[in-house]
Swiss-Prot record:
Regions of compositional bias (Acidic residues) in chain numbering: 767-781
Places the protein is found: Nucleus
Residue numbers annotated as active site: H442 (proton donor)
Family (UniProt): Belongs to the metallo-beta-lactamase superfamily. RNA-metabolizing metallo-beta-lactamase-like family. CPSF2/YSH1 subfamily.
Gene responsible for this protein: ysh-1
Protein's name according to its UniProt entry: Endoribonuclease ysh-1
GO cellular component, one term: mRNA cleavage and polyadenylation specificity factor complex
Bias type Basic and acidic residues, positions: 755-766
Amino acid sequence: MASKRKASAMATEPEEPVDPADELMFLNLGGGNEVGRSCHIIQYKGKTVMLDAGQHPAYDGLAALPFFDDFDLSTVDVLLISHFHIDHAASLPYVLAKTNFRGRVFMTHATKAIYKWLIQDSVRVGNTSSNPQSSLVYTEEDHLKTFPMIEAIDYNTTHTISSIRITPYPAGHVLGAAMFLIEIAGLKIFFTGDYSREEDRHLISAKVPKGVKIDVLITESTYGIASHIPRPEREQALMKSITGILNRGGRVLMPVFALGRAQELLLILDEYWGKHAEYQKYPIYYASNLARKCMLVYQTYVGSMNDNIKRLFRERLAESESSGDGAGKGGPWDFRFIRSLKSLDRFEDVGGCVMLASPGMLQNGVSRELLERWAPSEKNGVIITGYSVEGTMAKQLLQEPEQIQAVMSRNIAGARRGPGGDAEKVMIPRRCTVQEFSFAAHVDGVENREFIEEVAAPVVILVHGEVHNMMRLKSKLLSLNATKEHKVKVFSPRNCEELRIPFKTDKVAKVVGKLASIPPSLKEAKTGHDGPLPSSTEPQLITGVLVQNDFKMSLMAPEDLREYAGLTTTTIACKQRLKLSAAGIDLIKWGLEGTFGAVEELPEVKPKLEIVKSENGDTKMEEADEELPHGDDVVAAYLVMGCVTVRYRASGEVELEWEGNMLNDGIADAVMAVLLGIESSPAAVKRSATKNPHTHSPLPADKNPHSHLTPEDRFFRLCMFLEAQFGQDNVSPIVEPKLPPLSPTTKAITSPSEETAKSSDVKSDADADASMDVSEEDEDEQQLKARERAEVERLERMGIPKPGVRIKVDKMEAKVWLEDLEVECANKIFRERVRAVVERAVEVVAPLWG
């Protein structure tokens, strides 16, 4: 019996938190676990890209659209259309005309050319449908009005839109089909759309972009892990089935998309008919309203096709020139045995024929009408050559039902009412044969897996596939992780299921301009060049302006902004003037130094001034008689904090000047506050009110008023500091000093009263007998008091008014002895707290007892 794994072995390692800006958001609005209405959203670093905008061929009206209401389309920057098929492009007119989409739309030139006619034909077919349940979500006018909004681009060209880089590559699915490489902030995302790696007669097969490291691969999973039969065997089986139906006198219906695989099948049939003359009596029709219009597009874009079609083009052109035919004939798309059928009104339904008709899903149009007409005959046959979407008539036919519902025509011979009394439901018996040969131009399981392995992206997102096919491919890809060192993450989100994948990228700034001339640090020098190493090993600091453009960061000096970033810088010089009526230059300097510390005196040009003495002995500065130029009356100028210049003029006007920025503005505000309050400040008034001595001797230097404090003042300030920390009622002075331990020296020191007592003891024996009556306790008490008095006197001589301070908080008590600032307390925590406060108090009141 297998042992059960421990929970610890199954637990995942905790992941570091990720910034939401570093997460890639992926959302399927359509095409998630289904085929049809493909529409995907990718969002990264504030940029949004929409991939495809199709309709579901099995649904009608709004139900066929992607879930546009689940996302704000106004945030989309770029919409990329991979190819012109209905399930990838048919809802684009709705997005452009009916929603708040404001981005730009891109597709290849061939896709745009065919898209115009294909969507226009689709709208017209929908208008002529006899199905009462069908409804159009946009009109032909909407389509033609929004068509100029589409921008066409070429393969292998890179375009930058709103910091998003896109590059289309050939997909090999249909003419103009593209795979897109999308780069956002260094993250490379590759979207395949529908793609094919099979070599066919006219398209270039899909290839992996060379020299590109892809981070996320978004790929189709249409066929899951199923494998296709080799191409020659499929073509042989297809022609055997077609000729078999013709040989029994039947008609062959091949439902195809108007453009895409139909052209490949036409090339196969035209080549086979040219080699087998016995079948040239059977006409081959291409029934599509778009046949002639879109074949011109194919003839135009021969240059974007593969070498086979180019070779055929040269051969046909040479044959045409040798036979003398007019120019423009004999190209690879000028078929010899194919007839274009614009409508069924001109079709004579007599005898055997091969009919390629659109649409490929048999939901409506010419192909559905012919199916309802030919289904009752067992001689006829239907051959499905493309992928059949769930819910469509093509998918139902593969199950070979006994009868089908009439949609295009209800009065056909043999038709009868459906069960249940539903008068609107007309059923037609199906007796024709149904066969399937895959020419869908989608990769099979092997090709898809090889492509994914070749891309080697760490993250793979599967789209465009039915649930069972997608899950099989996902399981196969995950099983390959067993042999890989770096595991691949595979996701298959459903519609409207938001997927978030973290991608952490290093932010690297390129140093340009003058800063680039600074030599690299020691570490860089060791690995960057072979020259001598710099002597300094200190980390190198560089100051500059960091500029981000298109997710690229550059570090440069401010003076290089114009050259390297296209930006201009502006310096704002701010000035402020105020008039002081009483404050002189000395008082202004004193106030600035008291607030900002040392100020730098600037060497400003000073005018000629006279010193005039007033009656009370004050001196003041007066201007000389001669006129001075404007601006030259500056008495003194100072630089505050290295950024604010203060100029004092003879008129009493003070001017402030500084370079405007957030820091300098704050310092200038502080200087203004000092100047506006300097005339009313008590300290300034006291200082300015001092009379100058009537002597010619130099004035004594200004002294700090707090430099000469009495011991009582210092003790008071200490107590005030402690009361602020522990409370006023919890701090009290200690009167009794802390006595040092007794020593012979201490015993020899006695008070004057003790010396008098000793002399009296020597004089008379009677007094000695009386002293013997005194108890030893009284003698010890007197001696203790004498020692305390001596200790207090010693402390006072040192300038310590009180021996100590007692601090009580709740039940805890601490004593602070001021001589050595020793703290006594039974509680260790409280003792350390008191010691820290006392040390801080000493720093504030310091020097405390010096």
